[in-house]
Amino acid sequence: MAVVFDHPKSLLDVSTHFCPGCGHGIVHRLVCEVIDEMGIEGDTIGVVPVGCSVMSYNYFGCDVIEAPHGRAPAKRTNPDKFVFSYQGDGDLAAIGTAETVHVGTRGENIVVIFINNTTYGMTGGQMAPTTLPGQVTQTTPFGRNVETAGYPIRICEMMATLSGTALAQRVAIDSVPHIREAKKAIRKAFENEKAKRGLSIIEVLSTCPTNWGMSPTESMQFVKDKMIPYYPLGVYKDVTAEEGAKA
């Protein structure tokens, strides 16, 4: 009998600390499936920051290092390795905004996996830079008021304006078709790194049932009904498409 699905070899066979319904497990699997398919586990280095994914070094089979809060994409060494950072919105879009922007201006040849769940997960559900207008959090109990808290940051749209960005794409994991599309995007990002095209950033709209106060099923519906309308899915920059159009 043909094997149509198996546990990724580069994803360690251990229990994770993630909450039930959290999207990190899905994204971890997708990243590791791509690493396995490309046969690059021995040449891959992951960088994880402060946040819910801080213990991902226990789950990825490749080499993984930790970075101070927000500093994961501050990378310049080992150009022969496949390097990816795995960051949340409180990390990448808040304290790490400078590093995020300048990794794009420098065109560093790395992959950034950006998990957008509109909240600070590890610290208890405070407002994040990506929290939706009107969304209730621990620090916005009456909903995010844009007059006092400003507007959410649309990272992909911002990163697409930078010359060193090769790929900026937003995906989601609220449905099987969207999960498949997310894997394709992650694969393309790693292929870009292999071809040394520059920075590839994949933003993943994900869930945080615990801090949202929802069930896993309700959380997936929230992504579909609330997050995707505000953060439209799609490719915001793709240098390979631009090169093809010029050919």
Per-region residue spans from a language model:
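Thiamine diphosphate
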Residues: 1-121, 184-188, 195
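Glycine-rich beta-alpha junction loops
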Residues: 50-52, 117-119, 175, 203-211
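Short, hinge-like loop/turn segments at secondary-structure boundaries
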Residues: 63-65, 103, 128-132, 218-221
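Conserved thiamine diphosphate
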Residues: 80, 128-195
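Active-site-proximal loop->helix
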Residues: 97-102, 122-136
